[in-house]
Amino acid sequence: MQSTSVCIIGAGPGGTMAALRLAKDNIPFVIVDKDEFPREKICGDALSGKVPHIIRRLSPEILERFEEKCKPMHSFGIRFIAPGNYVFDVPFIENYNAEKHPVPGYTVKRKLLDAFMVEEVSNIAGEKLMTACTVMSIEKGEDGFIIDTSSGQIQAKMIIDASGAASSFKAPYPKPEPEPKKTALAVRTYYKGVKGLHPENFIELYFLENILPGYFWIFPLPDGLANIGIGIRKDVVLKKKINLSAVMDEIIRNNPLVSPRFRDAERLGKPAACRLPLGNPRFRIAGERYMLAGDAAHLVDPLTGEGVGNALYSGFIAAEQAIDCFNENRFDDAFMLAYGQRIRRVLGKEMSISTNFQKMLKYPRMVKWIAKRADGNKHIPGLMSSMFTDLDHRKKLLNPIFILRVLMNR
């Protein structure tokens, strides 16, 4: 049996970020993952500006190595397609200047990101990184946990569970059952040779009437590839009996804005499905000697479906909470509340606003009316750009009176 201060379960973005942050303060850890790396991971492959921001905060040198090794494509905005085929190009940052502004976003295969982060951990952790290692059971003791794995037992004073949407960590309290409204289902595949991609690599979100409050996406990738997919809330999928793969194929074949662009494109492999645990304030993410991070903590953005940026942030915050625990020699429930409070302070407002936006998308007629009024409105692109940099502006967009004034050009 090996002993350590922190056992991190899961070597995805949340787990590896936690490991790298712990290492900066010389906190001993072991990190385990059931997979070998590099591994395929179902994802949209789009990374918001949160990703370079938090990696730079951890280490500017790591961000430089990421750009050098993974060669991510810089993405500068979003092309929204609303019901009625109204198209709006919205830059992440208006009048972007590379010398003044940070990288607004990336697209890169998740397989490459995860492998890079694991390599960074391997360089500092060596044999403390245990891949192809399955957690069999976890037993809570007075001074921590005994984790029984396929590679032997680990004794740890704390656990950070970053094992994803399929997390089986049994916390010592009853978890609420996952709600269909707090879960999204998604299908994605890869294509080569899709025509008409934006020259500044805008990602494309199609809010089509028959799939609201979900969307169809086209995300450009390096080497002439594109990540194509569709994501819809689980309760809507169940109620309407939606076959996601079939709907995705129907859009590619028949949508007038999409179909011509795929005429000479080649699909690479079969579609793959995944489950996205959306932000849920009822979900408890910390307690005596443990924390949940990333998808295990239900931190996927309810509007955009982004999970990687929030996973990295939560891994960073979990590590700093663990550092505080060892500095103060406190691991009790009351002390661990600080982790959830910091997560809510950093991510909670954004999650709440995204949830309310997603609720608005349930009403196709209203969305279509807004899109029609917004078409050609010179104020809309700038206003929507501000959504990505200013949460107060995003909150304003939930005010019907404010929306009406903008749409009426007042």
Language-model features, listed with the residues they occupy:
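Glycine-rich FAD pyrophosphate-binding loop
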Residues: 7, 23-43
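N-terminal FAD cofactor-binding segment of flavoenzymes
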Residues: 41-84
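Predominantly flavin-linked oxidoreductase catalytic cores and closely associated redox partners
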Residues: 120-261
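Residue-level detector of alpha-helix initiation sites
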Residues: 12-13, 37-38, 112
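Beta1/beta-strand and adjacent pyrophosphate-binding region of the FAD-binding site
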Residues: 1-14
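FAD/FMN-dependent oxidoreductases across multiple families
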Residues: 137, 153, 236-321, 327
